[in-house]
C-alpha cells in the first residue's frame, strides 16, 4: 500500500489537529459541572458517559495524520486508566496543554530534544511536590468522598465506602448490572469457593438444600477418598468429640461416599464432603490457603502425611461453614493471624511479579478470600443507557478509591497541580535556554485541569487559576459552590496516584510528540465503484 509522508511542522500541525479533536471531546466532561458525551454504537442504544478513556477509545479520525495524533493522546488516557483506574480526562487535558504550548516553542525555534529534558525535570519536580502534599486516607468518610468526587455522585461514594469497609482494602469488589431499578450491595463474608457438596443427601436443611455446620472440624487433603478405612480413625475421633466434619478432598466416591451418606441419614454423625477448588498447582495453593485460614494442615503425600494417621490437631476449625449445591463459604477460620498475614504478603508479592493478567486476576481472588471477602455492587437504573453510564461511574469511583488507599490523598479539583507549580517555577528559574522553556511548558500545563474545570462551570479559567495560586497549599476552587475552600475539609479529594500518573503519562506522550520530525501514513484507497446492474426485464410484453 502506498504511503503519504509529511515532514517537520507540516507533520506536527496535522497531528496536533487530531490531538485537539480528541482532547476537546474529552475535556467537556471534567469537573462537577462537566457534561456527558454520547457515543454511537454499531448495535444497541448509544452510550452516554463522562469517562475519559471510554470516549477516547471510540475516536477514530478520517484523516490519517490527524488520527495518529489522536491515537497518541488516546494512549495517555489508556495508560493512566491501566495504572490508576481514573484520571483519564485530566491526563488528556494535560497532554493537550503540553503539546499546544510545545508547538508554539518549536515554531519559535526551540530544540525539541532539550525541551524534552526540561519537561522531564519539571515533571519529576512536580511529582515530588505532589508526594509531599499527600496524606494517608483516614476512615470510611474520606473513602466515600474520594469515590463521590470520582463518580460525581454522593450515593455512589457511600456505597463504595460501605463495600470497602466490609471487605477490607484487599477484598474483591465487583460491579454488576442489576435486574431491578435499585442499586444494592451484597456481601459474601469469609472464604468462598465454587464447589458444593458431593451428595445432596449431605444437606442439613432440606428446604434450602444446603448444609450448615457450626464450629466444624475441617479435613483438607489433595487425595481421592474411595475407601472408608482411610478416614475411619479420624471419623472415630470426630464421633467421640461430638463435632461435625467438613472434608475437602480431590474427590469422595465409592464405598467411602456411601458410608458417609448412610451414617448421616441414620443420624450417627454429620459429615459433608466437598471437592477441592481449582486445578493443578492452583488447587494446591488454594488448599494451602484454606489450611492457613482455618489453622489446619493439608494431608498430602508430598508432606509425607497419611489420612489413616490424621489427628484432630491436623484438622482446621471455623466458626461456621455453609455448603450449597455449587458453593462453599467458610466464615471465621481459626487460623493463626500472623500466618494469614504472611500468606497475604506472599500473594501480594506474586501479584506484583506476574505479567499475566489471568494469573493476576486469580491471585487477587485468592488474596480477597484470605483478606476479608467479596462484595458485589449491583447497579440498577430505569433504562439500559442510564445503567451503563452509572456502571462506568461506579467503576471509576472504585478504581480511584483503591488508588487513594494505595498512595494517599491530596487536595482535588486541580488545585494540587497549581500548588506543585510553585516548586516547578523555582526549578525553572535555575535552568537555562530550552531546558527552562521545557520546564515552562509543564508550568503552563499544570494550570490546564483547573482552568478546564472552571470553563466547564461557565467561568474564566485564567482568573480562577491566578486566585488559587495566591492561596496557601491545600486551598482550591470548589466549582460546584463557586467558592475558594480548604479542599480536604470540603471533601474534594483526589488520589495522589491518579494525580501523579496523569502528569507522568501526559509528559511522556507530549515530549515524544514534540520530537517528531516526520510522519508516515497509509494512503486510503478509494472505495470501488458499484458494479453495473443487470439488464432490464421484459416488463409487460
Swiss-Prot record:
Entry's Gene Ontology molecular function annotations: ATP binding; ATP-dependent protein folding chaperone; isomerase activity; unfolded protein binding
Keyword Cytoplasm attributed? yes
Work out whether the entry's keyword set contains Isomerase.
yes
Name the InterPro entries for this protein.
Chaperonin_Cpn60_CS (IPR018370), Cpn60/GroEL (IPR001844), Cpn60/GroEL/TCP-1 (IPR002423), GroEL-like_apical_dom_sf (IPR027409), GROEL-like_equatorial_sf (IPR027413), TCP-1-like_intermed_sf (IPR027410)
Record Pfam families: Cpn60_TCP1 (PF00118)
Residues recorded as binding ATP, renumbered to this chain, are 29-32, 86-90, 413, 478-480, 494
Q: Which domain of life is it from?
A: Bacteria
Q: Name one cellular component (GO) term.
A: cytoplasm
Q: Which GO terms describe its biological process?
A: protein refolding
Under catalytic activity, the entry for this protein gives:
ATP + H2O + a folded polypeptide = ADP + phosphate + an unfolded polypeptide
Location(s), subcellular: Cytoplasm
Q: Which UniProt keywords apply?
A: ATP-binding, Chaperone, Cytoplasm, Isomerase, Nucleotide-binding
- What's the EC number here? 5.6.1.7
Similarity remark: Belongs to the chaperonin (HSP60) family.
UniProt function note: Together with its co-chaperonin GroES, plays an essential role in assisting protein folding. The GroEL-GroES system forms a nano-cage that allows encapsulation of the non-native substrate proteins and provides a physical environment optimized to promote and accelerate protein folding.
Assembly mode = Forms a cylinder of 14 subunits composed of two heptameric rings stacked back-to-back. Interacts with the co-chaperonin GroES.
Q: What NCBIfam families does its record include?
A: GroEL (TIGR02348), PRK00013.1 (NF000592), PRK12849.1 (NF009487), PRK12850.1 (NF009488), PRK12851.1 (NF009489)
Protein name per Swiss-Prot or TrEMBL: Chaperonin GroEL
Species assigned in the record: Lachnoclostridium phytofermentans (strain ATCC 700394 / DSM 18823 / ISDg) (Clostridium phytofermentans)
Provide the taxonomic classification: Bacteria, Bacillati, Bacillota, Clostridia, Lachnospirales
What gene name is listed for this protein?
A: groEL
